[in-house]
């Protein structure tokens, strides 16, 4: 859960809660599309822009809507394929479902529908004889209650009653009534009277006959005050588990809460992706990452490198990688970036360190840097070199290592022309060999140079290894 705030611009855009955990951005096209389609709320598109924050509850609901929408699209594609297939064609339906990312066919076991016929018929007799509380009571209500009890006793003891025309109503209707009763019992949270309470109420009505009730307002149930007194003790006990459950939930989510300055507490919990080892702050963020990056068909293919992407927006953003265009410029150091998301992450490096390591206490500017730093305290080397087999603790170290295999030295000292594989070594060289010139450098001047990505370096070194084997 997020930290409550009094600034309304940071409230949840859908429910106005102040404990927000997620900010909707322009690149979250699925979120923006679903919210616009279902609720007619144009997030990130207003002029002037309103708040685009979501609380954990709303973010979870929208995530389920996105997943359900994708599932519906897959199902419609399957139906279109089956509709245009010939009747004599044999289709492996299970394989077809798996091809479109759907689980194998399964039947849901509804236990509450497996009810004894005797119980169904007895409950039907009870429904037919007891008048509804929402209707105005008849004058002979007490006599009708006595008849109801007699009918119930006869239903439980005499098998002839079960064979009567009243009890021989089709089984479908009885199951439907039982299903409605089950849904009503499950949805009720406050007024849950037990069978013993109902029997006591009937006995009280038999012993003391109340005067004819006064005419009440329309829609108000008869005996609401009495029902409230009967269930008063149950209400007290029923609220206690809710409070306990809420306190447990708060304790569980407090570990993920952030400080008022935006920094994460030392007791943070990471949710790692088992496929790419990227970590996330919440389970919902991890699930969305798996859905966007590792799940579903990738129908948009890049013309330059053949990479498949799930959305057209992702394709347009990816195609910037193959160009020199960097439309997003940092106002502090004039560094250029392909999209606003990378610029937003980079802008955090110019601020005060906010993310604290819970092992050594070191503070870092961004969460990504913190995640890389945490592997300093472990012996795990997840990133392996395919050429020499050596391991690195993070992707940056592997990238520098692969640059050494390729012989590329993209970082060049502008004072003496010496080239380096990493920008850190280049900056260190400037301060050691050219301290006077380095101190006069313009800090706003961008020092970034085009460097191959980690995937491109892996492809280059893989081809080099094949060439050596041949």
From Swiss-Prot:
Residues 214-225 have a biased composition (Basic residues). InterPro entries: Znf_AD, Znf_C2H2_sf, Znf_C2H2_type. Residues 195-208 have a biased composition (Acidic residues). Pfam families: zf-AD, zf-C2H2, zf-C2H2_6. GO terms for biological process: dorsal/ventral axis specification; maternal specification of dorsal/ventral axis, oocyte, germ-line encoded; Toll signaling pathway. Residues 10-82 form the ZAD domain. SMART domains: zf-AD, ZnF_C2H2. Keywords: Cell membrane, Developmental protein, Membrane, Metal-binding, Phosphoprotein, Repeat, Zinc, Zinc-finger. Zn(2+) binds at residues 12, 15, 55, 58. The modification Phosphoserine is found at residue 168. Residues 156-265 are annotated as: Disordered. It is found in: Cell membrane. One of its GO terms (molecular function) is signaling adaptor activity. Residues 237-254 have a biased composition (Basic and acidic residues). GO terms for cellular component: cytoplasmic side of plasma membrane; cytosol; nucleus. It comes from the Eukaryota. Residues 1-103 are annotated as: Required for homodimerization. Residues 255-265 have a biased composition (Polar residues). A zinc finger (C2H2-type) spans 271-294, 300-322, 328-350, 355-377, 383-405, 411-434. Signal peptide: none annotated. The keyword DNA repair does not apply. Acts as an adapter to assemble/stabilize a Toll/wek/Myd88/tube complex; required for efficient recruitment of Myd88 to Toll. Dispensable for innate immune response; plays a minimal role, if any, in the immune defense against Gram-positive bacteria and fungi. Involved in dorsoventral axis determination. Homodimer. Interacts with Myd88 and Toll. This is Zinc finger protein weckle. It comes from Drosophila melanogaster.
